[in-house]
Design a protein with these regions (language model features):
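Inter-motif core of Ras-like GTPase G domains
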Residues: 39-50
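Bacterial c-di-GMP phosphodiesterase catalytic domain signature
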Residues: 71
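Adenine nucleotide phosphate-binding catalytic loops in nucleotide-utilizing enzymes
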Residues: 1-3, 60-67, 78-191
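Glycine-rich, N-terminal phosphate-binding loop of Rossmann-like dinucleotide-binding domains
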Residues: 29, 50-51, 84
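Short glycine-dipeptide loop
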Residues: 43, 76-78
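ATP-dependent carboxylate-amine ligase catalytic core
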Residues: 1-41, 57-59, 65, 87
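Conserved Switch II/interswitch segment of TRAFAC-class P-loop GTPases
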Residues: 50-58
Length: 191
């Protein structure tokens, strides 16, 4: 069968990263996990964002079915992280991770996390995130993107950085703080 457009551009991006000797590439799946073109890689860590009723025509009609497809990215010996999920999705993710031999940890359960909505003169409306990783403590980091899901996604990224990011002294929290403060996603949830 012919390759899809997504498969071709995914292969092109992998070639580009290899030729550019990229140190780290953050690769997002297209729709799911199990049959996704990105699943040919063995990552340093696998991340699962909030599972919801998206792309049901491809992934399934229940959260459990969708979670089973998403869990297809889990690899033996590769740690995995997930944001908090509905119980039926969490159960499927835990079962799938155990089956393939991937250590799965949940933000807000195995990894301490809190977030809150704030409004300040300096930053306007935003979320603040606290996450206690194994090596780093991220306290009151600003997430200027609207929506609590953005705080969850930030926590997921911070936990991944904490898990696979190298030596602790290589990361200056002030750099992360400044980078997050400048984060923008024009056109998303703008009026």
């Amino acid at each position: 069968p012919d390759a899809t457009f997504f498969e071709v551009i995914t292969a092109m991006s992998f070639l580009h990263f290899a030729e550019a000797a990229t140190d780290v590439a953050i690769i997002e799946t297209g729709l799911g996990g199990r049959l996704d073109a990105t699943n040919v890689l063995t990552p340093s860590v696998s991340l699962i964002t909030r599972i919801d009723y998206d792309h049901q025509y491809l992934l399934g009609d229940s959260l459990a079915e969708i979670a089973r497809e998403k869990a297809g990215i889990f690899k033996s010996g590769v740690p995995a992280l997930s944001v908090k999920q509905e119980p039926e999705a969490e159960a499927v993710l835990r079962e799938a991770a155990e089956k393939v031999g991937a250590e799965l940890r949940f933000i807000g359960k195995e990894i301490e996390f809190s977030s809150r909505f704030c409004v300040t003169d300096e930053s306007g409306a935003h979320m603040r995130v606290c996450l206690l990783g194994e090596r780093m403590r991220y306290m009151h980091l600003p997430v200027p993107l609207p929506g609590s899901h953005q705080a969850d996604n930030c926590a997921l990224a911070l936990a991944a950085l904490d898990m696979v990011g190298g030596k602790t002294d290589e990361f200056d929290e002030s750099v992360i703080f400044r980078g997050l403060a400048k984060t923008k996603n024009p056109g998303r949830m703008d009026l």
